[in-house]
Swiss-Prot record:
Catalyzes the reversible formation of acyl-phosphate (acyl-PO(4)) from acyl-[acyl-carrier-protein] (acyl-ACP). This enzyme utilizes acyl-ACP as fatty acyl donor, but not acyl-CoA. This is Phosphate acyltransferase. It comes from Pseudomonas syringae pv. tomato (strain ATCC BAA-871 / DC3000). Its EC number is 2.3.1.274. It is found in: Cytoplasm. It comes from the Bacteria. The keyword Cytoplasm applies. One of its GO terms (biological process) is fatty acid biosynthetic process. It is an enzyme of class 2 (transferase). Pathway: Lipid metabolism; phospholipid metabolism. Belongs to the PlsX family.
Length: 340
């Protein structure tokens, strides 16, 4: 797909449309083949667009939506009471084929509920899972679930592993190493659902399952795809982001302590800046909702302009790779034994 069309929920997130419009226009400039549909309060979006010079309007359309979903709104209210919300209209553009992906920084629960209702799940998938990249010593790994499913059955963990493996392949990883996050690497460790999931994964043909991985092994790069329930995954993700921010702040403080440390810091500045960029949460912003019949990427509600750009770039890659269809084909093979 040479010219992806991405639908942007312009009203979602903590900062409203200002950051989202700015990030969208930056991506439009950086990717000449990209087309965007900004969904939300049209008059406000047009006003923000007008404040930027040289916008290619041939690749940008504004779709009006009269409602928006608050970050603390119940998913049921978003689903039943707001048929013209920016989030829902953006998803409907994907459902109707007018866009290949949706990106939103809005209410996570509402996005999950609306995505399931508007786009539906792939055959054999009970619930979508949220997946994102986290940095490791050797690069990064894909971690799922990140909070969409707090309690998971063994079957759900199995489905997550299959979907995560396919996503890693679309990102260029050959035979992705898939592991279950656990409190130990021994077979006797873990709760009942993790142990049952391990049995399912060991029997799965075509899946490079390597066993259990502990939290420190995730950061050592021992696996390309790490599977866990949404409670554990969300805690791990937020801890990773907090740790990265803390390390960057401590490094800055260390090299600004006195004249000598500032001189040493100046010499090391290129390497330090590279480390900060590699670890910056904004660079890894964007969690995919896997298992849907369409591409949906969830940005942090508090994402910066560069962070939201990362979420859009993830949507571009997944739409170009036609990820839902690739997942559908692999799932048909992996679930051929009738276990769905």
């Amino acid at each position: 797909m040479s010219a992806p069309i991405i639908a942007i929920d312009a009203m979602g997130g903590d900062f409203g449309p200002r950051n989202i419009v700015q990030a969208s226009l930056a991506c439009l400039t950086a990717t000449p083949s990209l087309h965007l549909a900004l969904v939300g309060q049209a008059s406000l979006i047009e006003e923000l667009i007008a404040s930027h010079a040289a916008v290619d309007r041939s690749r940008l359309r504004v779709v009006n939506a009269t409602e928006s979903i608050a970050m603390d709104e119940r998913p049921s209210q978003a689903l039943r009471g707001k048929s013209d919300s920016s989030m829902r209209v953006a998803l409907e553009l994907v459902s109707s084929g007018q866009a290949q992906a949706c990106v939103s920084a809005g209410n996570t629960g509402a996005l999950m509920a609306l995505s399931r209702y508007v786009l539906k799940t792939l055959p054999g998938i009970d619930r979508p899972a949220m997946i994102a990249a986290i940095p490791t010593r050797t690069g990064h790994c894909q971690l799922l679930d990140l909070g969409a499913n707090v309690d998971c059955s063994a079957e759900a963990l199995y489905q997550f592993a299959v979907m995560g493996s396919v996503l890693a392949e679309t990102l260029g990883v050959t035979k992705p190493r898939v592991a279950l996050l656990n409190v130990g690497t021994e077979d006797i460790k873990g709760n009942q659902q993790v142990k049952l999931a391990a049995g399912l994964l060991q029997a799965a043909a075509g899946l490079n399952y390597i066993g259990y991985v502990e939290g420190d092994g995730v950061y050592r790069g021992e696996a390309d795809v790490v599977v866990c329930d949404g409670f554990v995954g969300n805690v791990l993700l937020k801890s990773s982001e907090g740790l990265a921010t803390m390390i960057a702040a401590r490094i800055d403080a260390l090299f600004n302590r006195n004249l000598l440390s500032r001189a040493v810091g100046a010499l090391a500045l290129p390497l330090l800046r590279r480390l900060q960029i590699d670890l910056a949460p904004a660079r890894h912003n964007g969690a995919s909702l896997l298992g849907l019949q369409g591409v949906v990427v969830k940005s942090h509600g508090s994402a910066s302009v560069s962070g939201f750009q990362s979420a859009i770039q993830r949507a571009i890659v997944e739409s170009r790779e036609d990820l839902p269809q690739r997942l559908k084909g692999r799932l048909e093979v992996m679930f051929a034994d009738g276990r769905t």
